[in-house]
Amino acid sequence: MPRLLATQSHVVHGYVGNKAATFPLQCLGWDVDCCNSVQFSNHTGYGLDKVFGTITRETDLKELLSGLFDNFSQDYQALLSGYLPNKNSVRCMGTYYAKFKEANPEMIWLMDPVMGDEGQLYVSEDVIPEYRKLALSPKQLVDIITPNQFELEILYGGEIKTKEHLKKALKKLHQTIPVIIVTSCDCKMFDDKDFIYCVASMEGKTPIVYRVPFIDSYFTGVGDLFSALLLDRVYKILSNPTTTLKFEDQVNNVLNVIQKVLKITRSYASGKMKAKMGSALEMKEMELRLIESRDIYETINIHQTDYIYARL
């Protein structure tokens, strides 16, 4: 059974961060160890005045990761990092994840550089240099990143307004990162606002554009679930040189699973409710139904829709 260390947020109620990643990965046969970067009552979509809890101090995070490295440096097959609240926590995570990678170069690290979306930062600007150091490290520590377009622009260091800009950004980051999944791209770059566009790129191969129907509601934890499922699928490819699994098919499968989870979640909501930020009642209704979706995480368990749209 493969083992994974995940460092990201934790909520007591609901499903984001480690709460969104752990159960699906366990269903897929992973032994998951969670290191929580924050511990909140619920996610921030309920409204900032309805979130209670604490940020894990750098000294505490360091002590936890240090202990895990000293005791289990050879025990993990994969590393996952998601939301980290400040530059010190990013730096601390990066320092220890680098040690894990140096101790076991076969370990796969997926980094979700959570910084913001649609031109707005969720974190302080001093987090940016820390993520850029990790993404652009000549040591090539990170194997997979899952930024949205805004986060990709930050890592790349320039605006992305055309497909050519996108290809240049991917080419630059592929100098240090083998697998890049841009989880959402500006629909203006393509042709239809009724769809979400995702771009998957593996070093040395033509980037693939996926087009997924837009579900008109606000969900939280989707990116965390996506990263967890993607890590599982890519691990199955990279850890088995004789595999017949194809990268583009595995990404397509993850998108199918995500769509199915969102539809299941929507089906439990009252009437035609669609959640929006700051509405506690609506957010409660739209918490991801991960337990109800437990039978669909495996590739073979759901009907596959081909979301491949184009190649860059």
Curated annotation (Swiss-Prot):
One cellular-component annotation, GO: nucleus
Pfam families: Phos_pyr_kin
Keywords, alphabetical: ATP-binding, Cell cycle, Cytoplasm, Kinase, Metal-binding, Nucleotide-binding, Nucleus, Transferase, Zinc
Localization in the cell: Cytoplasm; Nucleus
Enzyme Commission no: 2.7.1.35
Binding site for ATP: 183-184, 211-223
Keyword NADP: no
InterPro entries: PM/HMP-P_kinase-1, PyrdxlKinase, Ribokinase-like
Coiled-coil region(s): none
Gene Ontology annotations of biological process type: pyridoxal 5'-phosphate salvage; pyridoxal phosphate biosynthetic process
Main location: cytoplasm
SUPFAM superfamilies on file: Ribokinase-like
Domain of life: Eukaryota
Catalytic activity: pyridoxal + ATP = pyridoxal 5'-phosphate + ADP + H(+)
Binding site for substrate: 9, 44, 122, 224
Gene Ontology terms, MF aspect: ATP binding; metal ion binding; pyridoxal kinase activity
UniProt cofactor(s): a divalent metal cation
Enzyme class, spelled out: transferase
Family listed: Belongs to the pyridoxine kinase family.
Primary role: Required for synthesis of pyridoxal-5-phosphate from vitamin B6. Important for bud site selection.
Alphabetized PANTHER family for the sequence: PYRIDOXAL KINASE
Protein name: Putative pyridoxal kinase BUD16
Provenance organism: Saccharomyces cerevisiae (strain ATCC 204508 / S288c)
Gene responsible for this protein: BUD16
